[in-house]
Amino acid sequence: MSISLIDVTCGVWDLNREKTLATLDAIAALPNPLRVLGWRPGPGRAHLAWQLMHIGITEELFATERFVGTVPAYRDLVPRYKGGSTPDDDIPAVDVIRDVLANSREHLRTTMSTFADSDLEIIPAALKERALSIGKAIKLLAWHEAHHQGQAHITLNLYKAAHQ
C-alpha cells in the first residue's frame, strides 16, 4: 500500500494548523484579544493578526488563482494580507481570523482533491514566472504556515513579556 504525497502533505498541514489554532486560542483566552492581535513587536513590524490572516489568505490564493485560475474568496482581504502587503491598523477579531483559516483551508483541500500525485510536476500558468510546480508549492505551503505560526508565537511571547 502506498500513500500519496498529497495525503502526506495534507497531514503535515493538519499538524501545522493545530499549532496555529493553539496560538489563536491562547490569544482568545487573554483579557483583551483585540489589543494582543494588534500588537507589533517594533515600529513597522507585522502584528499578530497580520501573521495569522496572512496564512489563510496565502492558502486562499493558492487554492484559487495560483493553482486553478479562479477568483479567490475574501477579495477585500487579499490586498491587506497577501505577501508583500503592509500591515494596517484595522485589526480583525479572533472569530474572523478563525473563519478565514477554516474556509481557506477547506478551499485548498477541495482544490487538492482534484489533483493526483501525477499532477505534482505541473506548473500552473500563475506560477510559471516562479517556475513553481504544484508539488513544490504544496511543500512551501507547509513551510509557510509553520514559519508564520512561529512568528505569531514569538510575537505573542514578546507581548506577554512586555505587558506583565
Listing of model-derived features with the role each one plays in the protein:
Residues 26-35, 110-122, 157-164:
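Surface-exposed helix-capping loop/turn segments at secondary-structure junctions
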Residues 84-125, 136-144:
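Acidic/histidine-rich alpha-helical segments that form the ligand environment
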Residues 10-14, 18-21, 33-82, 125-164:
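Short, contiguous alpha-helical
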Residues 26, 54-57, 103:
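Residues within well-ordered alpha-helical secondary structure of globular protein domains
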Residues 13, 17-20, 24, 101, ...:
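Hydrophobic alpha-helical core bundles mediating ligand binding, dimerization, or RNAP-core interactions
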